[in-house]
């Protein structure tokens, strides 16, 4: 228990900056039988992040939220310097949510020798988002791998909005034998369907209105799923084409593992587009050729989802 001295206080938020200290605290908690859950973020927290926290807390775990704007996952011309940083407000939100541990490192503490060792994402990392952001996923997987090592959690939570990211993290955890469960949480949306994102704050009123075309297109495509992948895409394209402010990068139907779309079965419809200078992504599950998502037949309650995690 000595490793918990000053590093963890039940019911209070303790903020850690030193990776080695957080590792000691997490392992000490696990050593006395506590579950530890990690919610990695880049800050600028919103309701979507807090839903990840809520899901993590359902299991009774001690929740660690990391806040780190990772320079490795920003490419040339991307918005590293402009990315919103709202640490004081973020920590207050975590206190209100009942989070007990926050990890707020710097680039110097995360990469003391520079980014000399990185994780290669494999072929999937060069597709979809990887076409326009060729270095993004290597940077993302590298920081996630480090956070999993540092926080030493039983389970880590990621949003389904970044579906390719979630898929690659699951791939990495499987391929590299990480001893951690990865739990995907459904996308949280505004009342008008816009997926919550820290980048939404870059949109002016007109752009924000135009951006709702992404979710509208996805929903329309999902409703056309009984006609197969081509019907899904044709329907979604029609919606996007009706809003000229939306500059589409890609719109694709894939399998749930982001392999080729099935002729019949569960898949994923993914879109990326620019609205003004802001790049947005979104996705939904689609029942290709059937119009009925198998996984949505009986949505689990919060309690059953928590029970499922604890039983694994």
Curated annotation (Swiss-Prot):
InterPro entries, A to Z: Pantoate_ligase, Pantoate_ligase_C, Rossmann-like_a/b/a_fold
Keywords: ATP-binding, Cytoplasm, Ligase, Nucleotide-binding, Pantothenate biosynthesis
Pathway: Cofactor biosynthesis; (R)-pantothenate biosynthesis; (R)-pantothenate from (R)-pantoate and beta-alanine: step 1/1
GO process terms (BP): pantothenate biosynthetic process
GO cellular component: cytosol
Enzyme class: ligase
Keyword check for Signal: no
Annotated beta-alanine binding sites: 73
Amino acids binding (R)-pantoate: 73, 165
Record's subcellular location: Cytoplasm
Binding site for ATP: 42-49, 159-162, 188, 196-199
Subunit organization: Homodimer.
Protein name (record): Pantothenate synthetase
Gene: panC
